[in-house]
Amino acid sequence: MTGSAEETFEVARQLGESLSGGEVLALVGDLGSGKTTFTRGLVCGAGCADYARVNSPTYVLEQVYQGRVPIRHYDAYRLGSPCELDELGFQEALSSRAVLVVEWADRVESLLPADRLLLELSFAGVEREGEGPGDGRLLRFSSSSAAWAARLASLGGACADNEQG
């Protein structure tokens, strides 16, 4: 769990530092739950100096960020079918060195590889002493991959509550 957008960013930044290329991250959550904030942190951790320009590619459907490893950021919110993502070259991107981040991944699940990290983001309603309701988020990581489980365990903190299987 994170208590603010800054903490969500930091968890993602740490995860981004561990990326080596070719990974797929599937992000799921309501509007405003932090998917784009998480992606911004991930892009920062992957070494993109221009991470502050990361925004949701809802209308353009895909953004590409260059850093230590390239990141292809997709948004499936407006797609009518998974085929539309495939028309953007998603299958080709899967065989590239790029890290693929898909917001609203539940809408294109049939295109995603089994070896992916699923992140479900939800509102936590965290209250901090003297501050009232906060900007908290629950981050629920899951993957069938032992490699993802080990990576998340090494990060500790908000990533500690992950599931494998």
Task: Give the predicted meaning of each segment.
Residues 56-73:
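AAA+/P-loop NTPase substrate/partner-engagement loops
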Residues 28-30:
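P-loop (Walker A) phosphate-binding loop of NTP-binding proteins
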Residues 16-22:
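Phosphate-binding P-loop
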Residues 85-165:
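Short phosphate-coordinating micro-motif centered on Lys-Gly-acidic
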Residues 35:
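Conserved lysine of the Walker
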Residues 24-26:
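Short hydrophobic/aromatic beta-strand immediately N-terminal to the Walker A/P-loop
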Residues 1-14:
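N-terminal pre-Walker A segment at the start of P-loop NTPase domains
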Residues 44-53:
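Post-Walker A helix-loop "phosphate-sensing" segment adjacent to the P-loop in P-loop NTPases
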